[in-house]
């Protein structure tokens, strides 16, 4: 299991300062919408300057009509990133075209499809998708696998079921990881790193428990032990 550190701080300088503290550790730097829109593609180069071994996860959750989404993914791939997210509900046609385009490249990032955001409660998900959360997460994940993507973004609580349905080689990335599961904030389906590993998660995403800590590096070292 691998650790992705979410760079969601208010200022670019704060994100870079955090990475300076984590230099030399085996982790992924997750750049989301806020940081990418604010700081641009050059932010990725600044991450690499701190530690060239940091792997870069561009978490943009692309969702659009097929060719628009595929073209956007191609532009992202040109930034030499290691992982990119797209929405599974964009449908099989969009995902298939996207993967055809990316597979033509000499090197492409891992493509992870978002199934159900971890901010969804069971009730909210049912209202939007008119289906039970775990059932629909597996259905969407199957569409993703048929389209050729590498894996899915899901909560810890769907990870094992997705692995059992689609095989252990189909990757799962699980956000909503907390040190204290009572500390949900804007997440609903949270778990700790040990539970993520028990449910066969390949990647975990941790943000606030790291950057709100007095000693972020110590928190990351503890998390890496659980990985």
UniProtKB/Swiss-Prot annotation:
An example of a Pfam family matching this protein is: OMPdecase
- Molecular function in Gene Ontology: orotidine-5'-phosphate decarboxylase activity
Which Enzyme Commission number(s) are on file for it? 4.1.1.23
Q: Which GO terms describe its cellular component?
A: cytosol
Please list the GO biological process terms of this entry.
'de novo' pyrimidine nucleobase biosynthetic process; 'de novo' UMP biosynthetic process
Q: Catalytic residues per the record? A: 61
Q: In which pathway does it act?
A: Pyrimidine metabolism; UMP biosynthesis via de novo pathway; UMP from orotate: step 2/2
Top-rank EC class of the record's enzyme: lyase
List the Gene3D superfamilies hit by this protein, alphabetically.
Answer: Aldolase class I
Keywords, ordered alphabetically: Decarboxylase, Lyase, Pyrimidine biosynthesis
What is this protein's function? Catalyzes the decarboxylation of orotidine 5'-monophosphate (OMP) to uridine 5'-monophosphate (UMP).
Instruction: State the similarity comment.
Output: Belongs to the OMP decarboxylase family. Type 1 subfamily.
The record's PANTHER family line, in alphabetical order, gives: OROTIDINE 5'-PHOSPHATE DECARBOXYLASE
In its UniProt entry, what is this protein called? Orotidine 5'-phosphate decarboxylase
Q: Which organism is it from?
A: Helicobacter pylori (strain J99 / ATCC 700824) (Campylobacter pylori J99)
């Amino acid at each position: 299991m691998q650790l992705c550190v979410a760079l969601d701080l208010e200022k670019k300088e704060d994100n870079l300062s955090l990475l300076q503290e984590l230099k030399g550790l085996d982790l992924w730097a997750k750049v989301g919408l806020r940081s990418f829109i604010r700081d641009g593609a050059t932010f990725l180069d600044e991450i690499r300057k701190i530690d060239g071994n940091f792997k870069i996860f561009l978490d943009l959750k692309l969702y659009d009509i097929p060719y628009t989404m595929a073209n956007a993914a191609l532009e992202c791939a040109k930034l030499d990133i290691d992982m990119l997210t797209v929405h599974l509900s964009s449908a099989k046609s969009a995902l298939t075209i996207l993967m055809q385009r990316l597979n033509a490249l000499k090197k492409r990032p891992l493509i992870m499809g978002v199934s159900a955001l971890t901010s969804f409660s069971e009730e909210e998900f049912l209202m939007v998708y008119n289906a039970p959360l775990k059932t629909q997460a597996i259905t969407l994940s199957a569409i993703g696998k048929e389209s050729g993507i590498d894996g899915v973004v899901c909560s810890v609580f769907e990870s094992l079921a997705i692995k059992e349905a689609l095989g252990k080689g189909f990757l799962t990335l699980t956000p909503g990881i907390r040190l204290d599961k009572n500390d949900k904030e804007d997440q609903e389906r949270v778990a700790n790193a040990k539970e993520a590993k028990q449910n066969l998660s390949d990647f975990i995403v941790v943000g606030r428990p790291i950057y709100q800590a007095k000693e972020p590096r110590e928190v990351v070292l503890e998390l890496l032990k659980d990985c």
